[in-house]
Amino acid sequence: MRLGETMRRKAMNRKKIDYTEYANVITKALEKGIFLTSKAEGNENCMVIGWGHIGRIWEKPVFVAYVRTSRYTRELLDKNPEFTVNVPVNGFDKKAFALCGTKNGRDMDKIREAGLTTVPSEIVSVPAIKEYPLTLECRVIYREEQDASKLPSDIQKKFYSIDTAEHVSYYGEIVAAYMIED
């Protein structure tokens, strides 16, 4: 890590939080969507996710994110197994959510186009999103591709039609949790 990057990381005001005290906030926010940010080989991307959960496994705090195999985010996570979860606490920008939830990061810089501001994370190499200050920094400790054929038929029909990709589950150990403050 370069000196300038170290100074930027320290300059950003962050209030450390206990992730368990915000688990309900994060779970409720998933209903409308939260951002998952990834970065690899100099490319940053954020996407809106509505599926995930937070808890403990293997004596570690974990956020599990589900990403379709067709997504650009999956490519980035497979190259750099770190991500941030960025949760709105005072509402959300519908334009940013619409863009990041429907456009492909292979084709455009969604973060820039959505007018979002990235800030260096404390531990992982993936940035956080300033406008969505409740942040979890995660390192993938386990990854598994779903086999939709093992799901009940009603779920298969609703979520996995013939032309729809399956999901990869990324179990990210929560290595830092904080609120970004101005």
Region locations from a protein language model:
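Active-site-proximal mixed secondary-structure blocks
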Residues: M7-I49, H53-D182
